[in-house]
């Protein structure tokens, strides 16, 4: 089926499985619609590898994947490969169709905080190979970004004031997360926001909250102390840091904060349980980079906290935000170009992703901020983009998870049918049809609207609990 032999234990014994970084070709980047920033095309230098980019994640120098060594039988199209040229992801013509082969343990990786390939390959298989409709993970299939500001210390106060004067907060909504204690790097350093005794910051957060921005917790009371020292065994010492931060932020905005980000991405499992017990909806995550809102596995098991969604960061190679650009010897133009590509990507693919930054770094990245504003303005004018906040998307994802739907057919007349239902409402749930494979799409039960978007049809459900749609499949 796959055009090669693999699992050659009798022949290779202990060498049956190899380990290597994974590389995608320029063609694969387009074919699989790999997210900007996930591939590093400069990792392997020039020569035969110049058109192959290494798959990356945040902070790790390399991602090393286990894979079977293979023996070719017939020609295949290699989309991803290992350093020794072993196909990692390939397609093979078989009969009147094609077979997609993934030579990595996708499910195993999902349970260990690296599920990008699993999600991307399943999406590609369903939409591009089987050519079936898919249920969008955004309301009305509207692409967008969660722009997450991490306010770690009092070094952010003047940059925030400058952003406000420049009209930055007139757009959005954004998700602004605050570390509220009096210290930042170490105890008694006086570098924190000291939110309970900081009238300016209190007034600023109240203004942004009233304007529709989402205000949340960034840990942890003392940013670096919590970020460096909290671990699985010291809940009794550090849970009060979460309590104090939560009380301070919630008191300031006049309602309970519902979204969270961990200082330095440090999130012990007890902190996730604390979020669930306090009724939080979402948290920023440095795991599963490249995904939208997802249910992360914890210690190899699915999260037991219903309704709580992880929002992975969007990595740019091995970094995630402005502060790290100079550390990696990069130029501002590199991350500016990445953000422009990311904005275009989410808009075209009807997806939501998170990008975060520290306001304290913004004085050094004014051109990047200008690019974000101008690019967003252009995409909004085209009806292709919107800003999201974490709580809003979490509510949507919980409703989406409640949707039950299936595809029937084709029958003798070549008709296929989607039957969908929800215990509440299907409002804004959207099915995306490849236009070249579906025609005469019509709603036979329930409410909805149909519109064409480039080479796709978007079927947006109305406020009814059930929906049936028929269409003629194009061979």
List each model region and its residues.
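Extracellular ligand-binding/catalytic regions of CAZymes and related secreted enzymes
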Residues: 86, 93-149, 153-162, 366-402
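Surface beta-strand/loop "capping" patches
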Residues: 391-435
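Catalytic grooves of carbohydrate-active enzymes
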Residues: 106, 144-152, 313-392
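Metal-dependent polysaccharide deacetylase catalytic core of the NodB/CE4 family, i.e.
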Residues: 2-18, 168-272, 281, 286-296, ...
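An acidic, glycine-rich "communication" segment
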Residues: 2-77, 83, 424
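Solvent-exposed beta-hairpin/edge-strand motifs
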Residues: 380, 431-447
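C-terminal beta-strand-rich structural cap/linker in extracellular carbohydrate-active enzymes
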Residues: 427-429, 452-475
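Short, surface-exposed beta-strand/loop micro-motifs that present aromatic residues
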Residues: 84-93, 342-344
